Structure formats: C-alpha cells, structure tokens
Amino acid sequence: INFLVDFSLYDKNQNAVKEQYGGSDWNREAFSQQITHAKRQLELMAKPKIKVPRGHYTTYFGPAAVNEILGMMSWGAVSGSSWKKGESALGLLADGAKKLSPKFSLQENFELGLCPPFNERGEISKENLPIISRGNLENFLISSKTAQEYDLEDNGASQYEGLRSPSILPGNLKEEDILKSIGTGLYLSNLHYLNWSDQRGGRMTGMTRFACFWVENGELVAPIEDLRFDESLYKFFGENLIDLTQFTETFPETGSYQNKGIGGSKVPGMIVQDF
C-alpha cells in the first residue's frame, strides 16, 4: 500500500463521521466521492437521533464495521492453540456442530503487501492461507510453538496466532443496491468496544459508533442512539448472511501501541437478516 488517509468529519454539535481511504493507486475521483458521501452522512447526523427498540433487524455493516468484527477473530478464534485448549470461537465449526454460510471465505493473504510474510522468529508463511473457504474451516493459524506442543504442522503463524493480513472475499451486492436491500432496518458504518460474550459459543458483543442510521423503505432516515448488540458469528457469518458487497476496502493497521503496527486487512461490507 502506498498511501492512507484516515480522517473524521465533525459538525458543531460534535457529531462525527469517520472514513479511511488507502491503496496502491491514488484515484482522485474515488477519494472525492468518499468525501462527498461522508459529508452527506454528517448532514444526516444533525437530525434527532432515533432510539431503536430491542429486537432483530435487517442490518448492513459497512467495511469498517466488518473490519472491527474481523479483528475479534484474532482473539481466540483462528488460533490453533485456542482450538486445542477448547477455547476457540471456531471450535463448533471445527467439530461440525455449527456451519457458516458458503458465501463467507476468509484468508490470511500476504499478497496484499501490507506486511512481510514472515513472523517474529523469521519463519516464512504461505502467501495465501485459506482459513475458511465457502463456509468450511480449512486451517487454524498454528505457530511453531503450538505445533511442537500438540504435534501439529505449523504454517508460519505468529506466536500469538492472530491474523496479520486477512481478506474476506467479496460477494454480489452492488453499492447502489445496499439501501434497497435493507428495506427497513439498520445501516452501521462503524463499531467499537467489541468483546466475546461467549467465546466458545462464538458470541460477541459490541456497540455502534460513528455514522449509524435507521433506514425506512430503502432510505436513510436519521441517526440512531448508541446501541449494544450481542450476536453469534454463526448467525451473521452463517445462516443470516444475505450477501457481501462487490466492493472491498483496505484497512492498513494504524495502531501505535509500543510501536507502529504493520499489516492490515481487505474486506467488503455485508448485509445480515435478523441481527
């Protein structure tokens, strides 16, 4: 990746819309469209917020929101050690007790060029390692330490066995069809405060953040009050996954705890029923 613009727009009431634009080839028109889109959302944020009653809704997650969910997979889901200890959020998938949608595929993809394909011990990883292919579990991330401990074959994973350069494959949902596909429901641009509420069961909790809206009859109506969700990945990546978007966004790692983070992800948006 050659550039990254990580920005937020605020109005006088401190309502905010957060966006990120990164890639290898700068496209002035695409960046301009993203700014225009963010400005329109900020205008909507000035409207009175709607309190959404507790329930289940058709929900669109923008790529940034999907990226937050994906980040949780590095905390006790894709780890080979967690699997062997019976703690993995994907354990039910590994055991055949739960299924994911054939529309969902996840890879550790160093071909993105977001970080080097070797870990802190200099061990080389495959350039593209399938984790989940069309809903089927293919690989856990297995470090050399875990491989030695459990007599497994390592695949160059880092010692903490988290995703470093993941990508979720896109689907068939066109950008212009997103609101129509929601009908009446939720449009969630960003999430935060995610955590496992039941790690072994694959349930996570979190809260909405920037630019989240109520949608009626295929139109953005107004922003929503912050809300908390608690849902199983076996539902939103499984039976309730309607589709993923045709477009994807790249999110370079921007963390700077102790040192500048490397890596990142490439993900689409997704639309889910009964969330």
Question: Can you describe what each PLM-predicted range is?
Answer:
Residues 2-78, 244-251:
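Internal alpha/beta scaffold segment
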Residues 79-99:
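Amphipathic alpha-helical
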Residues 20, 24, 41, 52, ...:
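Generic, low-specificity signal for short hydrophobic/alpha-helical stretches with a mild N-terminal bias
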Residues 93-275:
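Dual-mode signal for accessory low-complexity, basic/Gly-rich regions
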